[in-house]
Every structure is written in structure tokens, then in C-alpha cells.
Amino acid sequence: MPSVTMRDMLKAGVHFGHQTRFWNPKMKPYIFGARNKIHIVNLEKTLPLFNDALGFVNKLASSNNTILFVGTKRAAQKAVAEEATRCGMPYVDHRWLGGMLTNWKTIRQSIKRFRDLEAQANDGTFDKLTKKEALMRRREMEKLERSIGGIKDMGGLPDALFVIDVDHEDIAVQEARKLGIPVIAVVDTNSNPDGVDYFIPGNDDAIRAIQLYVGAVADAIIEGRQYAATQAPGGDSDGFVEVEEAGEAQA
């Protein structure tokens, strides 16, 4: 199973927390100390928790479960969209719509509308409309693409959430908790780890750190999915070649 090392985390700046005056006392067990009024995360505590989270993700993926990636802050958007796409998982990289989980029935209707508009754009329907009507539909489609494009193939509620920054994504975490959906999340020194099933203490702002978290989770999912494929009728162990390549790329 893919795993991370202390060196990986140091290079990515995982150990740099927030300013000491913004700390959350519940993160005290995971803080090594402070430097220049910045809390330093104890990576010896982070390492096993990070790998535990990867193990949980790998287990879910090996049972063909769905993990929804959530990262709407600017530093996380690109990595979340790219890595979720790479491992075939749904994602939310722009604003979290209230009720995205707890009001799934309404979200499903929006997905249907989005698919209808996509079909119209592809089959030439837009070309038969007036310029004004075609423009209005394209704008509607673009708006839906931003808000729900990453979950259009989710098919139903996810089996788990993987979240970058629990404070920024507090509504998503609350909805998951309400529905009993497990939450895997990166938790910085200014945040509260309560309510997170598998949390990774670390920097949730630096792009390199976010890329490390999201890339490692994607690798764990890919390996889990490939394991599931080998267990299916007609499965072939050749699928493990790609995981080795992914691991080399990460290193």
C-alpha cells in the first residue's frame, strides 16, 4: 500500500502550522513547539495517523466504495480536481452547496439538468436556438459545471469524505456527521479534530503539502481499486503495474 515518509512531509512543509495566537488547544498533543510564533506540528505523531488514514482509504477502495474529495479553498482546488479525477473519484472544488449530502434528492435533480444541458450542447440543440437562449443555457451549464460537475457521476451518497481544511469545509463535515458518513481530513493547528474519524495533523494551506495529502490518498485508492479488480471474476494481477509507476512518480 502507498505510504508517506517523514522526509516527504518535511519537504512539503507539512510541519508548519498556524500562528500560535490562532491555535486550538485540542491540537496540543500534535504540536511539537513553536518557532517565530508559528506552531510546529509533531510529524512523529502525524506519520502514523496519515498512514492509518491511507489504510482506511485503501480498504474502502478495495471494496469499490466511493470517497468524495472536498477542497474548495484556492490552494486546494487544482490538486483536488486533478487527483480525484486521476483515481476516478468525485470531488467538490468550488463552493460547497448546503444540502449537497443532506438534501441529495435536490442535488440529483440539478445533476439531471446538467446532463440534459450537456446532451443539448453535444447534439446540436443549442445551434437551433436563438443566440440569447443558447447563451442563457450555456451560462447555466457552466454554472452547474462549477458547482456539481465533479459529482455528476457519483450516483448517490459517498461512503466517505476526504477533506482539506475542516474549518473551511465545516458545512460538508457537519452534513457527513449527520448522515454517519466517515470523514478523513487534514487538520491544522488552528482547527478542532473532533468529529473527524481519520485526521491528519498538518499544514492545510501550503500547495505542496496539499498535493502530498491528495496524491497519497489517490494512490491508495488506485491500489485498492486494482486489488478489487484482481478479485473479480477474470481479474488479472497485471493491474499492479500502474501502482508501482504511481509510487515511483510520488517518490
Swiss-Prot record:
The keyword rRNA processing does not apply. CDD domains: RPS2. The keyword S-adenosyl-L-methionine does not apply. One of its GO terms (molecular function) is structural constituent of ribosome. Keywords: Ribonucleoprotein, Ribosomal protein. It holds the Pfam family Ribosomal_S2. SUPFAM superfamilies: Ribosomal protein S2. InterPro entries: Ribosomal_uS2 (IPR001865), Ribosomal_uS2_bac/mit/plastid (IPR005706), Ribosomal_uS2_CS (IPR018130), Ribosomal_uS2_flav_dom_sf (IPR023591). One of its GO terms (cellular component) is cytosolic small ribosomal subunit. Gene3D superfamilies: Glucose-6-phosphate isomerase like protein, domain 1, Helix hairpin bin. One of its GO terms (biological process) is translation. NCBIfam families: rpsB_bact. Belongs to the universal ribosomal protein uS2 family. HAMAP family: Ribosomal_uS2_B. This is Small ribosomal subunit protein uS2.
